[in-house]
Amino acid sequence: YLDFFAGAGTLNYGHNNPLAKEALLSYISKSGISHALDMATTSKIEFIEEIQNTILKPRQLDYRIQFTGPTGTNAIEAALKLARKVKQRSHIVAFTNAYHGHSLGSLALTGNRYYHDEHYGSRNNVSHFPFDGYLGNFDTSILLEKMLADPSSGLPLPAAIVLETIQGEGGIRVATAGWLQRIAAICRKYDILLIIDDIQVGNGRSGCFFSFEFCGLQPDIICLSKAIGGGMPMALLLIRPECDQWQPGQHTGTFRGNNLAFVAGKALLEYWRNSQFQQDVATKSNVVRSALHAIASEYAEHNWDVRGKGLVWGLDVGCGELASAISKAAFHRGLIVETCGAHDQVVKLLPPLTILESELNQGLQILSDSIEEVVLGTHAKSCSTVNPGVDASNNANVVTSLPITFEATQVLI
């Protein structure tokens, strides 16, 4: 299979990447320890040095690193807890169509009603505002600032504003540089921490290592997981020094010292030592952009929308049933893609950053053929508008509902 799902963004460098395999096998063969809680180990020190020297210092970024646990939601929970401690306030601002996780704190930030239907825990102390583009051409940052400036608006002064620069599960909605800069300015004006969730669209997925680089932001806290561990479980925070106000033992967890993730993560961060790697991602991004716009033009009467950047792209076909049918047709042809968006109406593409251009073109051709098969079939007849009754459980990897198995080595990278 060609995998354009990439473990929901965990496998940015492909399945069984040879650099990670070699590093892991060498480490294990030398009896390197797998787990050390939060104690110092050689592999942990080497990972920290790699991220500082290869990622942070070249970008003139000064952050402290906190390992929070194995998954992205652990990073979000730690960021919320720290922001509330630093600012001595409880309220948080999040955005429409946001997705930040399924534990109670991160779930409160998540916009999709479907994820809340079976969870009756507290969702207090979070307000959702319209994301960039949610109200068409209206600048939604104006509404946020208006309510913050008005002491009678009913909006408490928040400890933090949490956002994704590209909403992945929300439908590949890309915030503009101007909007992000205005949100950052609002944070500075009202003494609010800016937390960027770069769990899925960071780690090079947007074309730069951090998704916010293109607009010059310097968030107070950055949440990273998924690909940062080289395909192994890891989550961490990058924290501005003045916000690092934890006292010993205030935020702990058992699985914060996954040495196998340190080894794999360090090996794959080395891609970023070579500027050509980022240029190659930009070239592949243009290939995907051109292919999706060609598909949208071919079916212009359906008014489909193409959104994305780097190697995170979405084709909004306006209907969850249609998008799901395209995903399933592609799978049967050997291409793995998922769906996303409020109604699962977006076909989502996350090819590995390391994919060969020939494989990328092959996958895009499969997608085009699958769309032709579905549109010429019966699905298109019932999908002229967005179907609000779409079961959002399809947001998971579509292959999980099919009775198949495959070895990792069968997936091309």
Where would I find each of the regions flagged by the language model?
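Conserved N-terminal phosphate-binding loop of PLP-dependent enzymes in the Aspartate aminotransferase
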Residues: 1-394, 398-413
